[in-house]
């Protein structure tokens, strides 16, 4: 199956969706790569998914930003959970919609209403996020704590890094292994992948082992390029 989720913003006045994210590239049931739009959905299936999601969220009277997650298989969706918070992968949605989800969440908390109508939301292009973790894929994703040496982050057109790492930054073994997120946007999926490849090549983090080399392999794998994968793809193929 695939892991598909829908970003929503809901207030007393109305509920809007910010389209879907595909989070099917995972390890240990945790996301590695997220993208939007999902390359596996058609417009008819999208409409059905969005309509049911908005109806569900409106029915329970939810207010704020949230994400409704589904398992998708054989053109059928199965409800998984709703996360009543900002997701790690929210930047891909921001990149394609141009909407600051944090700002909108604060506005809803302040006013009780959404400032957006569904007609205001018109996604453009394709965005991909890679979670950069301090862990060793060759050792079953063993954490790699330590002190960061040289650190050079990529930059450029439609490229975004969310994180706070720097030379001398200490990564402890006590918390989540993710150290930053790399997000790239393109006019289409091919361009987004190309931009992500360039950005990963530019990214330098010394002193600890990271998942940067793994992301390069995943992004350029034939199965990923053809969107022929599911939540167990990485484990079955043993890509490290």
How does the language model describe each region?
Residues 1-240:
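ATP-dependent carboxylate activation and anion-phosphoryl transfer catalytic cores
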């Amino acid at each position: 199956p695939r892991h598909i989720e829908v970003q929503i913003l809901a207030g007393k006045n109305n509920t809007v969706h910010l389209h879907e994210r595909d989070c099917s590239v995972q390890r240990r049931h945790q996301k590695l790569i997220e993208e939007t739009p999902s390359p596996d959905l058609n417009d008819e299936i999208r409409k059905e998914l969005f309509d049911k999601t908005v109806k569900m969220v409106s029915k329970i009277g939810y207010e704020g930003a949230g994400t409704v997650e589904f398992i998708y298989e054989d053109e059928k969706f199965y409800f998984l959970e709703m996360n009543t918070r900002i997701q790690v992968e929210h930047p891909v949605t921001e990149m394609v919609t141009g909407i600051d989800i944090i700002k909108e969440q604060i506005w809803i908390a302040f006013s009780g209403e959404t400032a957006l109508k569904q007609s205001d939301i018109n996604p453009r292009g394709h965005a991909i996020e890679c979670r950069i973790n301090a862990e060793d894929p060759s050792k079953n994703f063993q954490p790699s704590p330590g002190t960061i040496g040289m650190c050079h982050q990529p930059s450029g057109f439609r490229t975004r890094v969310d994180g706070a790492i720097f030379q001398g930054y200490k990564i402890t073994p006590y918390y989540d292994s993710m150290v930053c997120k790399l997000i790239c946007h393109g006019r289409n999926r091919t361009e987004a992948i190309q931009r992500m490849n360039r950005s990963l090549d530019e990214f330098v983090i010394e002193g600890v082992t990271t998942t940067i080399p793994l992301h390069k392999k995943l992004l350029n794998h034939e199965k990923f390029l053809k969107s022929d994968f599911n939540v167990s793809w990485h484990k079955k193929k043993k890509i490290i």
